[in-house]
């Protein structure tokens, strides 16, 4: 311990050296001294002889070397812990930021689906009472996108389908995906669906349903009577039928009595086709809940108005009375999104 003994013999100003605690605060080898450069440590030795005597200390002393080694090891551990803590803090901050953004997105999404929101139609709780059945006048007054009017041959009732306002939650000011003209619709890849008398965006246009329905009920644009005016005075000529078939017109009118019911049934077929094929999109008219409800009661009222249907019994080819069997059944629920046949 020559270096320590020599350090003890150096004159100092009131400093004491504890041989049992060589690394006390007043020692020239104090813990605080090792944080600075060697030259600075030398200057901290408070003695009249200055640096010359201090430089003669044997800094390679075994005890000093051990302390230096342990001190450097502690420094490395501190630096490693500090780096890990910094990474942990930054990681927590990033995760918290993403959590906040996700929570905000979820809250905005929930708000958009709340009843009364202009972002999407209201979803009715299955445990709440169903919408009240529309009155007979409502069923007659609510129509579809193809503006037309019709009159019944059995009575003098006249009903219009072109002035029905959309429900409050429908965003009528949204930009139209197919534009506002036949040329613009074609340029955007939209498809004309006659039963809707509308150009439909390709994501929710079903050419297969158009062809299927046309095979079942015929080509409405060539087989129904069409007129250019509400007074039914200016008939659409056969030469003009291709324009109707191509969706290249502004507005036409028909007195064909089954037109409204066939339009409603077409929408239902589109919905069932989408469910069957797992399609995620539907045109705005057939998706409209108000329109679906209106169609159901409109067709029901029309059927009940046909007295012959209720009074007359159907007879088969052999002259036997046709009856319809209604056994009491018990149905399970299936996911609405299922594409499996039930």
UniProtKB/Swiss-Prot annotation:
GO terms for cellular component: membrane. It is found in: Membrane. The keyword Transmembrane applies. This is Phomopsin biosynthesis cluster protein B. Part of the gene cluster that mediates the biosynthesis of the phomopsins, a group of hexapeptide mycotoxins which infects lupins and causes lupinosis disease in livestock. The role of phomB within the phomopsins biosynthesis pathway has still to be determined. The pathway starts with the processing of the precursor phomA by several endopeptidases including kexin proteases as well as the cluster-specific S41 family peptidase phomP1 and the oligopeptidase phomG to produce 10 identical copies of the hexapeptide Tyr-Val-Ile-Pro-Ile-Asp. Residues 144-155 have a biased composition (Low complexity). It comes from the Eukaryota. Its main location: membrane. The chain crosses the membrane at residues 87-107. It comes from Diaporthe leptostromiformis (Lupinosis disease fungus). Residues 1-22, 118-186 are annotated as: Disordered.
